[in-house]
Amino acid sequence: MTFYLFGIRSFPKLWKSPYLGLGPGHSYVSLFLADRCGIRNQQRLFSLKTMSPQNTKATNLIAKARYLRKDEGSNKQVYSVPHFFLAGAAKERSQMNSQTEDHALAPVRNTIQLPTQPLNSEEWDKLKEDLKENTGKTSFESWIISQMAGCHSSIDVAKSLLAWVAAKNNGIVSYDLLVKYLYLCVFHMQTSEVIDVFEIMKARYKTLEPRGYSLLIRGLIHSDRWREALLLLEDIKKVITPSKKNYNDCIQGALLHQDVNTAWNLYQELLGHDIVPMLETLKAFFDFGKDIKDDNYSNKLLDILSYLRNNQLYPGESFAHSIKTWFESVPGKQWKGQFTTVRKSGQCSGCGKTIESIQLSPEEYECLKGKIMRDVIDGGDQYRKTTPQELKRFENFIKSRPPFDVVIDGLNVAKMFPKVRESQLLLNVVSQLAKRNLRLLVLGRKHMLRRSSQWSRDEMEEVQKQASCFFADDISEDDPFLLYATLHSGNHCRFITRDLMRDHKACLPDAKTQRLFFKWQQGHQLAIVNRFPGSKLTFQRILSYDTVVQTTGDSWHIPYDEDLVERCSCEVPTKWLCLHQKT
């Protein structure tokens, strides 16, 4: 798609360029919103550099605690293993298990630098020729504007590019160029430029694509015409449900311009669509609230904290600071906040109060058990690789035995340490647990009973002496069997597997049930700590407390994510905001 470009009155540096001699006029364009506009799959022998240094994000660092201890009578240096469910553990396990590989860098034949100042026609011609010689690219205009957008080049440089293109194409500028120019306008918060393009688009088009609306909304909220962004939001609703970014922009705009009622109405509308709001949206309400002395507003902020709890959401570090600032600004309440941690015992290191237990109540357990049995196990999909006959055989097997204390995913456990024979490792785990007089169930596959380099028949016979065993067909899924056996045995039963059960959690029907499942998982899944060959296996302690936003009325405890710690969805933060009222 192309457009005839006759100029825009707000582009004086473009259309009145001394290099190009173009006069004033009008142009029309459709817009889209993108997080970045870089071009992938560049030629190997070509690299891009800007003439000015680029800002880079801080490298995510995770502190690795190391300590010395005596292990079973021998002096060994042991690396502390992060708890299975604590933030950063998955990344650290990945780093510990990965092998470093050297990757040779492709040779760079030539480099082309992005301009940092407007170029004239001859300079753009030369840059285009240089690119063609180095890479063979013929789509110079599209490529260079993508790189400029990705590197957030200046508006004036982008204008000179558009002017050069217009001069060489009888006033025609492609859609792609205009789109990425507008992206730069929004990024650099050039509101007047966005407004002028908006006026032209209103005159030219009856409707826009959703991404175009999104870019206009983001560009307009900082202007005195921000309410027109709300009209664009209504236009989006005629086609699709607006995104959480659309709502975030409109809410931020409303708060920026002191329209609190509109902001809360948009927030309720967002929740009504079952959209999880951006954390920066929630943070904006707290930032705005420190200047408002209104009980109704305060109650709504407390509702946001309840929403975080019910949906197991964790604020970032900056958001946590905003929450602390708001609490301490509430007149007459004398709230005092501090950033702290929770001890292994479940006590807050700051105030000494006990954090909620990780164990489910009997009512919660029965509710979760029923929904897992119905939605995860009896739903059918989880057993698509299991025959009805085998499923029936397993159910009869479980019902014919007393409840188990520990259910072991045999194949998963056996493969935890690659340098150890699989049957030997499984026997080691079973033997240590059997010494504690625990009733054990090992779930495995039939191939584990066949003699091989990894599976000793003698060791597997010993496993069967110390534990009940069920060996499914080799194509069967293990996890549903493990869930069924553990839940059927009762709330006391634990299970061992490295699997984080993400798929099964996703099968559950609502956020509340998913939260109960994750809480149950944290309180019942045992993890084996890595160790040296020949040393005794160590089972990692189960967290005693529930990492979730919680209150006792005169105190709040809010877990939050540190800025420099990567946390996957199956992990929980280690840092807490402790808030309590002074007495």
Curated annotation (Swiss-Prot):
Cellular compartments per GO CC: mitochondrial matrix; mitochondrial nucleoid; mitochondrial ribonuclease P complex; mitochondrion; nucleoplasm
Residues annotated as domain PRORP: 342-578
Induction of synthesis: Down-regulated following mitochondrial unfolded protein response.
Pfam families linked to this entry: PRORP (PF16953)
Cofactor or coenzyme needed: Mg(2+); Mn(2+)
Catalytic activity, reaction form: Endonucleolytic cleavage of RNA, removing 5'-extranucleotides from tRNA precursor
Enzyme class: hydrolase
EC number(s) stated in the UniProt entry for this protein: 3.1.26.5
Extent of the transit peptide: 1-45
Modified residues (Phosphoserine): S98
Record annotation: effect of changing P480G: Does not affect ribonuclease activity
Consequence when changing D409N: Abolishes ribonuclease activity
Post-translational modification: Degraded by LONP1 following mitochondrial unfolded protein response, probably leading to inhibit translation in mitochondrion.
Effect of R445Q: In COXPD54; results in decreased mitochondrial tRNA 5'-end processing as shown by assays with mitochondrial ribonuclease P complex reconstituted in vitro
Effect in UniProt of substituting R421C: In COXPD54; uncertain significance
Variant or mutagenesis effect after changing A434D: In COXPD54; uncertain significance
Localization: Mitochondrion
Notes concerning its domains: Displays a distorted and non-productive active site that probably switches to a fully productive state only upon association with TRMT10C/MRPP1, HSD17B10/MRPP2 and pre-tRNA substrate.
Entry function: Catalytic ribonuclease component of mitochondrial ribonuclease P, a complex composed of TRMT10C/MRPP1, HSD17B10/MRPP2 and PRORP/MRPP3, which cleaves tRNA molecules in their 5'-ends. The presence of TRMT10C/MRPP1, HSD17B10/MRPP2 is required to catalyze tRNA molecules in their 5'-ends.
PANTHER family xrefs: MITOCHONDRIAL RIBONUCLEASE P CATALYTIC SUBUNIT (PTHR13547:SF1), PTHR13547
Illness the protein is tied to: Combined oxidative phosphorylation deficiency 54: An autosomal recessive, multisystem disorder with highly variable manifestations resulting from defective mitochondrial transcription and translation. Clinical features include early-onset sensorineural hearing loss, sometimes associated with global developmental delay or primary ovarian failure, peripheral hypertonia, seizures, muscle weakness, behavioral abnormalities, and leukoencephalopathy on brain imaging. Serum lactate may or may not be elevated.
Protein's recorded name: Mitochondrial ribonuclease P catalytic subunit
